[in-house]
Amino acid sequence: MKVLTIHDLKIIKKRAEGTLLLREESNETVATQCCGLALGTEHLQILICGGTGCKASDSHIIAERLQQALERNNIADKVDIITTGCFGFCEKGPIVKIIPDNTFYTQVVPDDADEIVGEHIIGGRKIERLLYIDPKTEKTVSDSKHMDFYRKQMRIALRNCGFIDPENIEEYIALDGYMALADSLLHKKPEEVIDVIKRSGLRG
């Protein structure tokens, strides 16, 4: 579809919003639970970090192994595998995140794929050995939202990293991608654009 107007962007946005809706951060009650086909979860997503560090540690092979495991179990139509941008926690990569319960698995290797599919995706049981261990409490933390490393951050420019597929333009548009550009080109004079940038406080 060729995008010529803001209306065109809104059509794409509406079409892609449903996919991203499943990735919305869960509330605290849901975050302590687990999803899985055996528990009645109708559809799941597996987010895999595709950043440089994780890819160097075989995250792309993990994605392939997960896809193969889904196909062997005849559930590939119930689970989407999505390669995202960097989660920002390279020390703990490769990172795999299960949606909708937001379980955050760290230092995953290709040989973990069958267990992730069998135990978590199908069985609805979190894999304790792959969960992040808080260095202060020495307790496992299953949701990145409750990790000190992330809790103290407020991402702005990088807020979509680890959330969308950087190679899927529709996912970017679903989060209002290009809306500001379209507004500037179609509705604002050059002087107004300059004024907005000045008032924004952006530098560099």
Model-derived segments and spans:
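Feature of Fe-S/electron-transfer and energy-metabolism proteins
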Residues: 1-204
